[in-house]
Amino acid sequence: MGNVVYKLTSKEIQSLMAQTTFETTKLPQGMKARTRYQNTVINIYSSGKVMFQGKNADQLASQLLPDKQSTTGKHTSSNTTSIQYNRFHCIGSDEAGSGDYFGPLTVCAAYVSQSHIKILKELGVDDSKKLNDTKIVDLAEQLITFIPHSLLTLDNVKYNERQSIGWSQVKMKAVLHNEAIKNVLQKIEQDQLDYIVIDQFAKREVYQHYALSALPFPDKTKFETKGESKSLAIAVASIISRYAFVKHMDHISKKLHMEIPKGASNKVDLIAAKVIQKYDIQQLDTISKKHFKNRDKAIHLMNQKYNK
C-alpha cells in the first residue's frame, strides 16, 4: 500500500472536497475529513495535510491535485519550462466552471500566432482569474472575432449524466480539451503550429488515458501549470472559456429570478436551498453539479428549516 502526503491551502482543500463526498463527523482528533474513493483512502487533517493511502494513491492524487507536489518526495516537478511560448505559433487550452457548484463546464482552445501577440498585449489579455466579469466579457467579445478558437460547453444535465456513469471531472476535461484542440486544428494551417499548450489539470499520462482519442501532435504538446501566465494562447483560452461560463451563469440567474453565485462556498449552499424551496430539487439538479457536497448541505438546510 502506497502513501502520498500533500500540504494544501484552505482553498485547495475546499476544491478537493468538492470532487467527492467526505465524512466530516465522528472523526479522530486532528482529522478534518475522510473518504474512500476509487479504492484509495483520503484523510484530510486540521493541519492542512492530506494523505492518500492505497495501491493507486499516487495516480489518484495526481488526478485530484494535478498542480501539487507531494511532501513525501515521490513527485519530481515537470512543470518548469524554458520555452518562451509567445515567440511561437501556439494552440492553448483552458477551462472554467470546474470548481463551481452552479453552472456548466466550459473549455476553450485558441490559436495564437506571433502576429497576434502585439494586439493581444495592447488589449490587456491576461489570466482571466485576475479580471472581473465585466472585463472578461469585454475582452472575449473582441477576441472571438479574430482568434481561431473552439468553445465547448458541457451543460449540467450532460455533466451529471456522465458523472453518474463513472466519468470523473478529470475525464470530462480531458475529452473536452482534446476535442477543442482538434477543432482548432481544422481551422488553421497545421504547418504553422509550433506547440499545443494545455493548462495542466492532470499529468500527461492521466490526460492521455482519459481523452478517448490520441493527442493530435504528441511531440508538440506541453502541459503547464499556471499556463495562462506562460502563454498568451492559454490566456486567451482562459478568457473565452470564462466568458462562456459567466454568460451561462447570467442566463441561469435571469431564468430563476435570483442571483446565482459562483464557487462552492456556504453562500452557494444557501442559494441552492432557496432554489429547492422556490422550485424543487429537480430544478436544482439541472443547473448544478450533483456530486458536489453543496447539494447535500442545501438539502440539510431545508430539512432543518421544516423540522423546527
Swiss-Prot record:
Give the protein's function: Endonuclease that specifically degrades the RNA of RNA-DNA hybrids.
- A GO MF term: RNA binding
**Which cofactor does the UniProt annotation name?**
Mn(2+); Mg(2+)
Give all residue intervals belonging to the RNase H type-2 domain: 88-304
| Entry keyword set | Cytoplasm, Endonuclease, Hydrolase, Magnesium, Metal-binding, Nuclease
What detail does the entry give on cofactor binding? Manganese or magnesium. Binds 1 divalent metal ion per monomer in the absence of substrate. May bind a second metal ion after substrate binding.
Report the sequence similarity comment from the record. Belongs to the RNase HII family. RnhC subfamily.
What the entry lists under Gene3D superfamilies is as follows:
Ribonuclease H-like superfamily/Ribonuclease H, TATA-Binding Protein
Q: Which GO terms describe its cellular component?
A: cytoplasm; ribonuclease H2 complex
Q: What is its EC number?
A: 3.1.26.4
Task: Tell me the domain of life.
Answer: Bacteria
Give the protein name, as stated in the record.
Ribonuclease HIII
